Amino acid sequence: MASGILLNVKEEVTCPICLELLTEPLSLHCGHSFCQACITANHKKSMLYKEGERSCPVCRISYQPENIQPNRHVANIVEKLREVKLSPEEGQKVDHCARHGEKLLLFCQEDSKVICWLCERSQEHRGHHTFLMEEVAQEYHVKLQTALEMLRQKQQEAEKLEADIREEKASWKIQIDYDKTNVSADFEQLREILDWEESNELQNLEKEEEDILKSLTKSETEMVQQTQYMRELISELEHRLQGSMMDLLQGVDGIIKRIENMTLKKPKTFHKNQRRVFRAPDLKGMLDMFRELTDARRYWVDVTLAPNNISHAVIAEDKRQVSSRNPQIMYQAPGTLFTFPSLTNFNYCTGVLGSQSITSGKHYWEVDVSKKSAWILGVCAGFQSDAMYNIEQNENYQPKYGYWVIGLQEGVKYSVFQDGSSHTPFAPFIVPLSVIICPDRVGVFVDYEACTVSFFNITNHGFLIYKFSQCSFSKPVFPYLNPRKCTVPMTLCSPSS
């Protein structure tokens, strides 16, 4: 019953023009009330089409603007009704129109709202396409179900994107932390090099000081002895001159001859302008070298060795280590997969290739040569039978035969093998290399497109040992290791070592 009374009250305070609860209600002298905006718009419309005649939109009774009065009583009722409409009890009545109290049976397609029949007739929905809810519910249920599936798919994509960005974030964090570690390590190496250079230079200066001062001290002693001899001789002559005639003449010719033949011994001196001038290390060159090695190590590949039927090498089971053996020994070495017997009338060869061929790109690997007195390493364009007969005599280790290698012999002689002259095409030009610190580990970097092969002394802070330029890579090349006749093995280092 209370709801019915409430609906009746709402009808009394509903604007006849907009069918909404009155807003700033104004009343005419005929008793009808309207929203201020609605009656003002109606007044303007009447002035435009009816030659200034103003009439009530409900009863058509004429009125004058001065007769319009604000209706505060109705405004208070509307305010109370709005509070009642927003109460929890009213809000729970979802099947009735909040404005008109009628059942919500229609769906407005343009506004996508559920409305009552009074809403359909209002100015807000006038001319819109409306349908019974039962007519469109199934259609929109299918559309919503499709939208839900689409949304779930997009949610999965969003979750994957979220996971991907988190993974990328973590990857970048790891990479930058790794780069920070490398930068710190590189500069620590630079500091070690500078400390070593300083210590070495100070030792050289101390040695120079010791040698010079020792020589000058010896010269000083000789000069003191010479001066003392002069004093004694002068004293003897003064004594003769002051003594008797006998003293004067006794042995006088010998003394005069001794004085005339006397030559002053001059001390050994050292010219300061001929000294070795100290020059600070080329820090820019060092940084460039470190950057080159750091860049090369980004292309570290996991190289393993490939057996062949022409090498007298022993390859370990993990295919990372190779050593030479006496060609007369014919048994299987423990822990090895491959051994090769001596071949009649065939020179003793211990070279082996890596399994991985290089046809493009950049490739880097490191070889442990510690405690070896002889070795050869680098890259090779593949074994050629006609080039193997004199290989152990170094006659074919030339770039023109597909070998870009450096080597060690007799424990201290480092060399690079270059092409021989036209007069001796089978004899390589062996160039000695200046290596201050003997490498226990050598890095090899191949840039196929740039046609270069570089060798780094990892033991000595990665200093460049030698670099081949303008290499003629006309076919695939392979890592090449040759332990020679030194039985100590050569070992390919893993990228994680």
From Swiss-Prot:
Task: Quote the InterPro entries the UniProt record gives.
Answer: B30.2/SPRY, B30.2/SPRY_sf, Butyrophylin_SPRY, ConA-like_dom_sf, SPRY_dom, TRIM/RBCC, Znf-RING_euk, Znf_B-box
Q: Which GO terms describe its cellular component?
A: cytoplasm; nucleus; P-body
| PROSITE patterns named in the record | B302_SPRY, ZF_BBOX, ZF_RING_1, ZF_RING_2
Outcome of altering residue 205 to K?
No effect on dimerization or higher order self-association
Q: Per its UniProt record, what SUPFAM superfamilies does this chain match?
A: B-box zinc-binding domain (SSF57845), Concanavalin A-like lectins/glucanases (SSF49899), RING/U-box (SSF57850)
Outcome (variant: residue 202 to K):
No effect on dimerization or higher order self-association
Q: Where does Zn(2+) bind?
A: 97, 100, 119, 125
Q: Start and end residues of each RING-type zinc finger? A: 15-60
Mutating residue 165 to K leads to what result?
No effect on dimerization or higher order self-association
Where N-acetylalanine occurs, the residues are 2
Modification after translation is described as: Degraded in a proteasome-independent fashion in the absence of viral infection but in a proteasome-dependent fashion following exposure to restriction sensitive virus.
The reactions it catalyses are: S-ubiquitinyl-[E2 ubiquitin-conjugating enzyme]-L-cysteine + [acceptor protein]-L-lysine = [E2 ubiquitin-conjugating enzyme]-L-cysteine + N(6)-ubiquitinyl-[acceptor protein]-L-lysine
In this entry, which stretches build a coiled coil?
137-225
Provide the alphabetized UniProt keywords: Acetylation, Antiviral defense, Autophagy, Coiled coil, Cytoplasm, Immunity, Innate immunity, Metal-binding, Nucleus, Phosphoprotein, Transferase, Ubl conjugation, Ubl conjugation pathway, Zinc, Zinc-finger
Provide the positions where the record notes the PTM Phosphoserine.
87
Q: In which pathway does it act?
A: Protein modification; protein ubiquitination
- Tell me which residues make up the B30.2/SPRY domain: 283-497
E.C. number? 2.3.2.27
What is this protein's function? Answer: Capsid-specific restriction factor that prevents infection from non-host-adapted retroviruses. Blocks viral replication early in the life cycle, after viral entry but before reverse transcription. In addition to acting as a capsid-specific restriction factor, also acts as a pattern recognition receptor that activates innate immune signaling in response to the retroviral capsid lattice.
Q: Which family does it belong to?
A: Belongs to the TRIM/RBCC family.
Which PANTHER family does the UniProt record give?
Answer: E3 UBIQUITIN-PROTEIN LIGASE TRIM (PTHR24103)
**Domain remark text:** The B box-type zinc finger domain and the coiled-coil domain contribute to the higher and low order multimerization respectively which is essential for restriction activity. The coiled coil domain is important for higher order multimerization by promoting the initial dimerization.
Q: How does it assemble?
A: Can form homodimers and homotrimers. In addition to lower-order dimerization, also exhibits a higher-order multimerization and both low- and high-order multimerizations are essential for its restriction activity. Interacts with MAP3K7/TAK1, TAB2 and TAB3. Interacts with HSPA8/HSC70, PSMC2, PSMC4, PSMC5 and PSMD7. Interacts with SQSTM1. Interacts (via B30.2/SPRY domain) with HSPA1A/B. Interacts with TRIM6 and TRIM34. Interacts with BECN1; GABARAP. Interacts with ULK1 (phosphorylated form), GABARAPL1, GABARAPL2, MAP1LC3A and MAP1LC3C.
Which named protein is this? Tripartite motif-containing protein 5
Q: What species is given as this protein's source?
A: Macaca mulatta
Organism lineage: Eukaryota, Metazoa, Chordata, Craniata, Vertebrata
